[in-house]
């Protein structure tokens, strides 16, 4: 089990790399994360949902997605509450304080899912959540040491040297956790190192001496890792490939942003530059496309969009002849009205949309979770993605759909001038034909590069990187 000294230390990436490395050695490997908190989710073949990090890890294993890979998924909503997804299905919502009372009931589901995976694999690589040293959350924990001890899984602790203070991260963890928890840790890894590793040899020795845990690896930065999707929204604030092409795509970062990995295939295109627009910034006037991504809290995010003045920027963008695409929650925002009579996303209410599409949306408790296959209505460009949304969108604008699904249903909407469009389908731009069609409309051309192939190459590169800087044979002995 890979646990971290904090969030964003690289746990998800290390698990994915280990999964691919051991798969390349001929083992049947599966990923597992007892509890994840993310609005970036993937749809499983049976209509459940798991964190997208586990979907990437499953890809690294060459395994089909399963709800058992991430039995508890928390999807943050407005305020301090979250939607609770257990073994792929929504079971309720809870405030942060109330969730502590849920955890004892969820441990059974976590261990059940782990047992199912263990029966099918030679090796399971487990990812913890957040920090192993959050002693205030230790009671009834199911994400880190609570799970590790219940399942008898050895732990490797990862620290992040890039953010500074890594010695204190590891030694401090040892000093605050219970001795019984510390005994589960079989060694530590230092991640994201830059420079000459010999200069940190004394640091590694000091950590080992003070913690009593052996050093299992000093992992340098891996350039190819940046090509893999980020799971957490604060990964959007760090340096990621954005291109330097002639087509500028502006993406506003809203508080409830979800499934933002829809952007990753566009980063692959040399003609594209992506500008992630943060609070306090304006939508750039030179953008050819403004893309509104998914949202877990659509009405609240629409209010935030207006507070930033981005509605004014967007109206000016449209007057200049710019293009707009809304995906899922972004699609809902582009319509005339959003209604949430049952308070599905928060307090019940209604909000005026941005009025760029002649549609309206009513949020309901029924959640659509399904693969989506079809083609563009305009040019027949094929796509393969998935739907994950609450409510339904309807109105005159739906008579001019963006997509035609394989079963003949119309999906999405396009404005009369063709410059504004919206859809519930995630993963559209993973398809070469869809990216080429979009870029042609924006005055560019597609590169012909396969997004799927780039992900596979990146996973192999990360696996080889870990093979070079960790003793994977020793890790296997720990697992046995």
Curated annotation (Swiss-Prot):
Keyword Transferase in annotation: no
Domain GATase cobBQ-type: 246-434
Residue runs in coiled coils: none
Keywords attached to this entry: Cobalamin biosynthesis, Glutamine amidotransferase
Top-rank lineage group of the source organism: Bacteria
Pfam family, one: CbiA
Single GO BP term: cobalamin biosynthetic process
Tagged with keyword Ribosomal protein: no
Catalytic residues identified in the record: 328 (nucleophile), 426
Function: Catalyzes amidations at positions B, D, E, and G on adenosylcobyrinic A,C-diamide. NH(2) groups are provided by glutamine, and one molecule of ATP is hydrogenolyzed for each amidation.
Family under the similarity heading: Belongs to the CobB/CobQ family. CobQ subfamily.
PANTHER family associated with the record: COBYRIC ACID SYNTHASE, DETHIOBIOTIN SYNTHETASE
Full protein name: Cobyric acid synthase
The species this protein was found in: Methylocella silvestris (strain DSM 15510 / CIP 108128 / LMG 27833 / NCIMB 13906 / BL2)
Gene: cobQ
